[in-house]
Amino acid sequence: MQVTQRWNREQAISLFNKPFFDLLFQAQQVHRKYFRLGQVQISTLLSIKTGNCAEDCKYCPQSSHYETKLDNEPLVQLPQVLAAAKKASDAGSTRFCIGAAWKKIHDRDMPLLEQIVTGVKAIGLETCMTLGILKPQQAQRLAKAGLDFYNHNLDTSPEFYHSIVTTRSYQDRLNTIENVRKAGIKICSGGIIGLGETISDRAGLLVELANLPEPPSSVPINMLVKVRGTPMFDNKDVDPFDLIRMIAVTRIMMPTSYVRLSAGREQMNEQTQAICFMAGANSIFYGRKLLTSSNPTEDSDKRLFRKLGMQIEKHTTIKNSNWKKKKLLLHDNQQHDNTISS
């Protein structure tokens, strides 16, 4: 179900400026209307190609433009990806996300990516990828393989964007999101706070997302993880109340989207995370590592969920017809193999 409203920046800013408890109350009302209280969706993120990225995103340690002492890693192959996906499934994740430090996907990598989607779905997980700029025909191929989600963040407002990135335009990002939408893949798109942006920039980001033809199915809200060697290492820390306000306004403006408390959780105490969940966050990344940054352990997340009385949401995705056919073929082949071996 999609609930859409055209937003303008003034309306969004007025939400940010609400008294804190009034804002929290409104966000909680919206959250209770469209989601089960106390349910959290769990994703696991794997980097299949780390570092040496041609982009100059000022927040990112994977950029080749900065000296961050990050160990570059080559492309991970299918068996290692599927082993990681199985481990994520066993730990309780319902979605497996694949990231690569690319500006764009090369056609030569498409067969591997298609095999990854098919293999991960055979494990029973939803699939998500974040691989940079995506051309229409590439989006269609990934959709045919069964890809559920594609992540492509807008990062910040259109006005502030070029202070952060110069190697990819804002329109490039919007074009990729449109290619994803037209291919029938669900959109995952959000942004980062702590880049030096203003309240107006945060409002502008959310207006862009909320006013897409279809708001994203999933909206990750990242808090800047400062890495020595990047231009943003000396940025001011994000005030926890600013993060909570960002979560709450996101929930109000995109009532049916999953709001993911994403990068930066390792720097948050349990109380901050709890209020973020109260403000409308209902998704997290699970596992010790997010691309290159640390993340709370599964055990610490489970302890927090127990304290809050929260439960992991069960996997309910309906697979597309192409995937159903592939699943039936896979099942038939397995039955045939069992007959031969018996």
From Swiss-Prot:
Gene3D superfamilies assigned: Aldolase class I
One Pfam family of this chain: BATS
GO biological process annotation, one example: biotin biosynthetic process
Known EC number: 2.8.1.6
GO molecular function: 2 iron, 2 sulfur cluster binding; 4 iron, 4 sulfur cluster binding; biotin synthase activity; iron ion binding
Pathway: Cofactor biosynthesis; biotin biosynthesis; biotin from 7,8-diaminononanoate: step 2/2
Binding site for [4Fe-4S] cluster: 53, 57, 60
InterPro entries according to UniProt: Aldolase_TIM (IPR013785), BATS_dom (IPR010722), Biotin_synth/BioAB (IPR002684), Biotin_synthase (IPR024177), Elp3/MiaA/NifB-like_rSAM (IPR006638), rSAM (IPR007197)
UniProt keywords, alphabetically: 2Fe-2S, 4Fe-4S, Biotin biosynthesis, Iron, Iron-sulfur, Metal-binding, S-adenosyl-L-methionine, Transferase
Cofactor binding, per record: Binds 1 [4Fe-4S] cluster. The cluster is coordinated with 3 cysteines and an exchangeable S-adenosyl-L-methionine. Binds 1 [2Fe-2S] cluster. The cluster is coordinated with 3 cysteines and 1 arginine.
Keyword Metal-binding among UniProt keywords: yes
NCBIfam families associated with the record: bioB
HAMAP family: BioB
Subunit composition and interactions: Homodimer.
Function field: Catalyzes the conversion of dethiobiotin (DTB) to biotin by the insertion of a sulfur atom into dethiobiotin via a radical-based mechanism.
Protein name: Biotin synthase
Gene name of the record: bioB
